[in-house]
Amino acid sequence: MTQKKYFKNLDATRALAFFFVFSAHAFVSSDPTVLNSSLFKSINGYGKLGFLGLEYFFVLSSFLITWIAIEEYKQNGYFKLKAFLIRRSLRVWPIYFLIVFTAYLAFYFIKYFINYEINELPNILNFIFFIVNFYTIDNGTNYLFFLVFLWSISIEEQFYIFWSFILKYCFKYLKHISLLLIVISLIFRWYYSFIEPINNVLYFHTFSALGNFGIGSLIAYISFKRTIFYEYISTFNTYKSLAVYIIFITSLIFYSDIFSNSYLVVFERVFYSLIFGYIIIEQAFNQTIKIQFGKSKYLSFLGKISYGLYCYHGIVITFLVYGLNLFSISENIYSTIFLYPLVIFITTTIISKYSYEYFESWFLRKKKKFY
């Protein structure tokens, strides 16, 4: 297979998605005065919109793997299922299992050698088989903080396996199956919004996120095929593009008002996935736009190490909180909002940079053998 297309601007959008996720976790405090302050409540409230970073990652990953598969079919006439799964494993597994196994070793050491009380962890098989999102639905998130993040990787892995077989054996129905995923997701979300309302299911269940993946793959299909719809939206001028971003920002400002309506909750993920789908097309294919995120070396750098940023920032937060409690460090609203997030971000960036250069890169070089 020849060199696959590289979307420079999309790398940078990964950094922006991480900032969303980071904002949901970075404002930490155990001081009642800080927690009850109006400023903290306001900032932390909007920070909870960080889940949209994950929504974007779902759409983007589906777009990229589908695009690569279509390229592969065009160049070779077939899709290498085994090679695809190996490539995905080489990218996802090293950091993932490093964190999982380290966490479990630390857990047993702390519990049985230090005799320190610590919440029980899920059965490790939930992580090994990438089904911890289902565990979380039933049991909640009251376990080691930085392991909780891995539920989204479970969903990604489940989709990779499912989608690889679709790409291998049902490729000619790709468009229809993508649309079907969106419909299934909407029906699923409707059922768990009205018939059997369970918030954890709406958030953590794989079926609830199928719309994200369906839209991502559909965007790849219409872009590669250069459909009329693609030609229209990929040539949006500045004003039309600005209108999309205004809709997005407005939805964030009034999020709690808009999505307090149960009917709109059904369409929440699809709504944002469509906006993210537009951003992907705009950044990947519209050469006339004035704002191209890939022009920022800083965003491109952070985008390159974004997987590490996502996986490691929870560990840094965990140690920060532990340190604050261990040394009884006094807190105030300014340290919580400015100092601690800055320390967390800088530390996470340094760890992720060296992880990418000296750990992940070894595995990434192996990926080239499987194209």
Q: Which positions does each model-derived feature cover?
A:
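Membrane-cytosol interface segments of multi-pass membrane proteins
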Residues: 1-201, 206-209, 229-242, 298-306, ...
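Alpha-helical transmembrane segments of multi-pass integral membrane proteins
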Residues: 105, 213, 218, 241-358
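Acidic/histidine-rich catalytic neighborhood
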Residues: 219-223
